[in-house]
Amino acid sequence: MSQSLISFSNLDNWLFVAPALLLAVLSGYLSERVGIVNIAINGGMVFGGMFLSLMSYAFVPNANDSAPSWSLAISIPLSVIFASAVGFLFGIAAIKLKADHVIVGTGVNLLGTGINFFVAQNARSLLNDTDLRVRYSFVRTGNSVSIEGIAIFAFAIIFVLLVWYLMNFTKTGLRYRAVGENPNVIDTQGISVYKYQWFGVMASTMVAALAGCCFALSPQVPSFSSGDVSGFGFIAIAIMIISMWRIIPSIVISPLFALAYVLTTGVVGNANNTYLLRTIPFIISLLVMMVFGYLNVGPKNVGKHFDKGLR
């Protein structure tokens, strides 16, 4: 048991899974701080992972080869850009048409799963492969972790800290947060509330897609045919609430939940026990929300449509 828990393999998985969860939490933060409830984080992650899997085929010369790691510098940005189209659809429905945010988010989640399933089922004709695989293989020698994993982990931490600084110490960031609290006050100052909301939705979707890319690159995800991101989009919402819609606490909590996820999925045992253990991170998040959730107050205008007539 101890060998399965304390290993470089689990550490390597954690270096990819922790950034995925942290970025997913940031995705929720970016949307709710402008008053948009975004439960489509899971769907955004699925689209990001799917596009990254598809992009990896463009750099594979032979059927049995793996895409070179340097191609990630091209694949990840393109995957995020492609996935942003989903954010545009979300914005049209939630901001322009003023549809219910939760219903729109549910639709995006279902859309992501459906499209990913279609691509995986037609992988032989579309990709000349038997499955929708993540065709990246990083070098790991002996008791070590991949350089790519360390780089992605460091990038995620720096990126999140940069967003934290912008949100708390710049005029634009303070206005951004004010949109989720009282958009009518912002509107009376001649500032476009819709502009900030559109930016929030698009940024949230792109960060969710980036989280999906990180998850898909984890060594424990050899195939993306099921479009399964282990419900990280939903657990990210729970962590956002536990963190009281603050970035710094999420930087601490997200890696801890990711560690619990990696350790439970790495336990060697019979199938029934393994699936039961995988529920531990989700059970913990529910228990913590039950204990501390009532103390947390989110942005006052979250989930409400902006109405200029309420000035």
Swiss-Prot record:
Q: Which CDD domains match?
A: TM_PBP1_transp_TpRbsC_like
Kindly indicate whether the keyword Cell membrane belongs to this entry.
yes
- Which Pfam families did the record assign? BPD_transp_2
> What membrane topology does the annotation report for this chain?
Multi-pass membrane protein
GO CC terms on record?
A: plasma membrane
Tell me where the transmembrane regions lie: 11-31, 34-54, 72-92, 101-121, 147-167, 198-218, 233-253, 257-277, 279-299
- UniProt keyword list: Cell membrane, Membrane, Transmembrane, Transmembrane helix
Q: Which GO terms describe its molecular function?
A: transmembrane transporter activity
Where does it live in the cell? Cell membrane
- UniProt signal peptide: none
> What protein name applies here?
Uncharacterized protein MG121 homolog
Look up and give the organism this protein is from.
Mycoplasma pneumoniae (strain ATCC 29342 / M129 / Subtype 1)
> Which classification does the entry list for the species?
Bacteria, Bacillati, Mycoplasmatota, Mycoplasmoidales, Mycoplasmoidaceae
